[in-house]
Amino acid sequence: MKPVSVLLIGLGRVGSRFYEKFRELGESRVRLVGVCEIDERHPLLQRAREGGVRVYENFEEALAPSENPVDIILDTTNIPEVKARIRHRLEETGNHHTVLLPLVASYLLWHMAAPGEDLPENHVQPGY
C-alpha cells in the first residue's frame, strides 16, 4: 500500500504532536510532504528540514500544483479563515485530489496520537 502524503499546517501543541506521531509511523505509512509554520524559530522546523520534510512559510506555496499532489491537509491552526483560504486555494487550482481534513477527523486522530490527553481548549470549536 502506498503511503499517505500529508501536509501539516501549524506546529503548535496539537500540530507538534501530530508531527511526532507521523514521523514515528515512518515514511512507509505516512509521507510528511511538508509543514507550514509562521514561527520561523520553531524547534521542529530544523528537525523537519534535516529529516527531508519541506518547510513552507505559507500554505499557498505548499499547495502549488505539483506532479505529486498531497493526499491530506491537516490544518491544526484552529483558525476558520485559514481553512476557508485552503478550501479556496484547492478550488482555485482545480485540485480535486487533496482532502482538507474536517476538524472532527482531527479530533479522532488526536485521540489516537495522544490517548488520555485532552485537546487544548482552543481546539474544541466545531466546524469544517
Sequence positions of predicted segments:
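Glycine-rich adenosine-cofactor-binding loop
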Residues: K2-F22
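NAD(P)-binding Rossmann-fold cofactor-contacting core
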Residues: L25-E50
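Short, hydrophobic beta-strand segments that form beta-sheet elements in well-ordered domains
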Residues: G34-I38, V55, I73
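Short, structured coil segments at secondary-structure junctions
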Residues: R49-G52, T93
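Short acidic-hydrophobic, aromatic-tinged amphipathic segments that line or gate anion-handling sites
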Residues: R54-L63
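Short acidic/histidine-rich motifs immediately flanking catalytic phosphotransfer sites
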Residues: E67-I72
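Short, well-ordered coil/turn residues at beta-beta hairpins
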Residues: D75-T77
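Rossmann-fold NAD(P)-binding glycine/threonine-rich loop
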Residues: P80-Y128
